[in-house]
């Protein structure tokens, strides 16, 4: 195994048929009839989601902005980076989408944006096609009162970057995109 070498470009899987079995504004579930790499037939369920976006928003005091909310699927409260989804209908670029999400969730804008991911990263590649981009956002300024979705009950706080990184390494921040963002930002800031 060599992660620096190109992987095969031809899929060993064969899709026989595909049908949408569920859709809402946030996800689509697709069921594919497939032939696996070993030649066995079967079905494969795929959750389709838009490109996810996240930002390590760092202020002049080296505090990171975190957003807290109850995560219904996990049944627990979660502290996370400002995150959202790219909306091709509303956002010209993924960065425009992240700027929108940062303002909506936190009431902040950033003057300095650095892309932390060299390409989209897969978030759970055995069940979903969801990928994500992450940025380091600095030179934060207030824009307005946050105007998040009416279904969201968000709390926004700032904590020292090192404390947030320690929380991620200890599992107290366990959102995958947030953990990755903090690790990548730590490396970028060295």
Positions of PLM-derived features:
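Short secondary-structure junction motifs
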Residues: 41, 76, 110-112, 177
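Terminal peptide-recognition signature
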Residues: 32, 62, 102, 160
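Nudix hydrolase/Nudix homology domain
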Residues: 2-13, 77, 117, 125-128, ...
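Active-site segment of metal-dependent pyrophosphate-handling enzymes
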Residues: 28, 50-51, 58-59, 71-73, ...
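Conserved hydrophobic "DFG−1" position in protein kinase catalytic cores
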Residues: 34, 57, 66, 136-137, ...
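Conserved Nudix-box catalytic region and its N-terminal flanking loop in Nudix hydrolases
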Residues: 2-5, 10, 44-47, 54-100, ...
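Acidic, metal-coordinating catalytic segment for phosphate/diphosphate chemistry
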Residues: 13-54, 60-61
